Amino acid sequence: HPAIVRGDFDMYPEYTGTSWQIVLKKTETYTNEKFNLLDQEYRRQYKLAWKGMFGFNDTYSLAIRADLAKRYNIKTFSDLAKYAGDFVFGAEYDFFEREDGYKALADSYKLQFKKAVDMDNGLKYQALYDKKIDVMTVFTTDGQISDPRIIVLEDDLGFYPKYMAGMVVREDILNRHPELNLVLDKLNNLMDEKTMSFLNNKVEINKENPRDVAKKFLMEKGLLEE
């Protein structure tokens, strides 16, 4: 953020929730209803505009093994709370230390797990498949959540902020090059969380080249020519 304000570059991708909390120093949870206010504050304070909102929300969530979700009919965090005492919860160490981490989430949803364990972030998924844990933290665009053995639950009380991705652009650039508005508008709702997770899976799991994955996707959407 400081670099674009200085004029080091003219646009960059950013997340709404990050900007709301870190840049604007707002304490209330960011929701999509606050987007117009976020954009207004960016224009007023920094002469920056939000354009080209990609359409995906890269926020925190909880995931459960699919067999358990089906057996207990668990679709939301609140559903999970009813049966949490039967389950082992796993998360990376810093999740238990953060202000918006385990304690705050457990208090908000009245979650009381049979056991909570901290583990390396890279080991969580395998631990879930191996039934060493039953529930874990995820990001909503993680490549591995497209695995059918996992169900991502709905944060039905809106505990976590929305981290919608979009472009932050200098207003003076938009004024000098109004045609940029049309280009950036083509990025609106380009992909949802499922699509982003699918693309991440190609890179994280299939080890495909990120540039090639992005290029192919943009060509399929008609935004790039061969």
Question: Model regions: which residues?
Answer:
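Alpha-to-beta junction loops
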Residues: 5-14, 84-87, 104, 123, ...
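A conserved helix-loop-strand patch within extracytoplasmic ligand-binding domains
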Residues: 35-89, 189-193
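An extracytoplasmic/periplasmic, membrane-proximal ligand-sensing/linker region
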Residues: 100, 106-111, 179-226
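A bilobed periplasmic-binding-protein/Venus flytrap-type ligand-binding module shared by bacterial periplasmic
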Residues: 59-70, 164-177
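A local structural motif
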Residues: 85-88, 106-119
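Ligand-binding "clamshell"
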Residues: 23-51, 130-132, 144-158
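Short helix-initiation/N-cap motifs at beta->coil->alpha
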Residues: 1-2, 93, 114-126
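Pocket-flanking alpha-helical
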Residues: 1-28, 36-39, 123-124, 140-149
